[in-house]
Amino acid sequence: MGNRQDGNKIGMAVIGYGGMGSHHARKVHAQRRDKFDVIGTFDIKEERQQAAREKGFEAFASREALLSDPRIELVVVATPNDAHKEIVIDALRHGKNVICEKPVTMTTPDLEDMIAVANETGMFFTVHQNRRWDPDYRTAKEIVESNTLGRVFNIESRVHGSRGIPGDWRNQKEHGGGMVLDWGIHMLDQMLQLMGDRRLLSLYAQLTYITNENCDDGFRVICNFEGGTSYMVEILTNNFINLPRWYINGENGTALVRDWSRRGEIIKVSNWENRDSVPIQAGVGITKTMAPRTKKTIKKYPLPKPKSDWMEYYDNIYDVIRNGVPPIVTHDQQRRLIRLVEAIFECGEDGKLIELE
């Protein structure tokens, strides 16, 4: 990649020193200073420039000044979503490797333009998909991939809140706000990673506008994958009682992950043949079909808790630039993700099932 000097630290800077931009700068400086030198930042708001100075970072006077600095090899773009394309292309043309915050952009044509410039300049360009390292996701991933439940036919992934959309650019559609592009882009990326190369056959989506009539404050999408797996992603911001973070059904049992802290359990059937059900009262009637299983026919297990370190993302960035290894987050993955987002918006507008791959 461009500006390779094997064995040296990578000079890094951040454009957009808000919540995520400051997070990148602080975390990398604290945890990976052996590989990266966080030189400075630029933000159009002076109070953020001052905040960067107070953390010991150089606050560049302009974007051009930052991009023209030969010490900087890697630029993190953490601006509002609608500004990503212009800044990413500018950085690439200045000979910088680029990490762009998610969503990389809002349309497939814009993404293709960015990739084209990366190819033209020979610079490395990728996207920050940090929630591939969320502990709860890693637990769900291990449950599915280990075949613990047998063939998995249903996965439900939920994130619920009760505060609506944040009161900054994230509630403005023209700036790329809304929950599909905010939280949704994370959970949809997790879904595509979890499903691997299985084709996404169709989807049905509903968008909500409870707290903001112009910008989606929530959505629900059901995706049907090759092999018979139904995968639901639900992001809602007006829920005062949260449903579980993950609910996974397989032929041999069910897994429940209650929250980010990975509280939950796995229950597996131990004896399918034991016909031990007796009628129970259900409302004003009785049922054997819905009678709970006895302890003789099921067994409870703790959730797996694989280790997860988000800084592996930056370790990979270093190895891509210095050693030429493949990136974890690829262009093709982002192409598929943005096409999925476009399909969700299309379905949310016309209410029709969308057939995909």
Write out the residue ranges for each language-model feature.
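Beta-loop-alpha module in the N-terminal Rossmann-like domain of NAD(P)-dependent dehydrogenases
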Residues: H24, I44, F57-V117
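C-terminal glycine/acidic-rich active-site capping loop/insertion
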Residues: N130, N252-D332
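N-terminal Rossmann-like dinucleotide-binding module
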Residues: M1-K55
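Rossmann-fold dehydrogenase core element
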Residues: D113-N130, G150-I155
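Hydrophobic residues in well-ordered beta-strands that form the structural core
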Residues: A61, V77, C100, F125-V127, ...
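C-terminal helix-rich "cap/oligomerization" subdomain common to oxidoreductases
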Residues: M1-K9, L74-V77, P304, E312-E357
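Predominantly a Rossmann-like dinucleotide-binding segment in NAD(P)-dependent oxidoreductases
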Residues: R131-N212, F219, G351
